[in-house]
Amino acid sequence: SMYDGGIEKIVNVCASVGGFQDTVDLMEKYPFIYGAVGIHPDDADKMTQETLDEIRRLSHMDKMVAIGEIGLDYYWHKEEEEHQIQKKMFRAQLDIAREEKLPFMIHSREAAEDTLNIVREYMQGGMYGGIIHCFSYSREIAAEYLKMGLYLGIGGVVTFKNAKKLKETVQYAPLSQLVLETDCPYMSPEPNRGKRNSSLNLPYVAQAIAELKGITAEEVIDVTRQNAEKLLGIHQ
C-alpha cells in the first residue's frame, strides 16, 4: 500500500531504550524500509554505556542510515540536572555519528539555544550532515541551521492553520534543504489531524509546501526525495 500511495522509501527512526529491535525487524522484512538508531532525550536518563555500544553496533548495519532521534527536550524535563544528562547523551550520540560517518536526526523542544550551540560546535569539528526533525522554531533559528548546510524536516504541522511560524520558515528555506517526514503516529496533517499518522499522508505535506512556495507538489516530492537520498546515502 505504500508504493500505491507514492511512497518509495521510509526511514524508521528509533527513539526509546528497548525499541531498537522493532526497527531492525522492519528493515529486514521490507526492502523499502531503512533505519536510524538513537535514543530520544526523554529516555536519556535510562541510557548506559551498553546502550551507546548497541547504537554503535547497529549503526554498522547496511540499511542503518543515520543516528537518531537524538537531541534535547526541556518541555517535560525542567530540572537542570535532567538537562545535563540530556546534553551528555546528546553529545555521546553525536560522537558516534561523527566516528561512524553517519548523518544525525535531531529532536529539539523548548531547547532552541542549547541545541543550536551543541550542533554548531559539532559541525565546526566536521560532521556528515543532519536533519532537524519536525522543525518548530523561528525563521531566525532555521537560518542558523541552513547556514550550516543542515536540512529541516517538515511534517504535518505545516498544514495546520495556526502554524504561522513554520509556514514562514518553509517559505524562507530553500527547497534543496527540506525533507518530508511524518513523526508517525503523531502530527497527522489536515484533513486527518487527530488521527494516527502514516507515510501515506505525505502528499498533504508536499501540497502545503508547494502552495507556500508557489511551485507544484511534484517538484516538492522530487526535490525532497533527492535531498533525503543524498543526505542518507540511499540510492535508487
Regions found by a protein language model. Name each.
Residues S1-Q236:
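Mid-domain alpha/beta scaffold segments of enzyme catalytic cores
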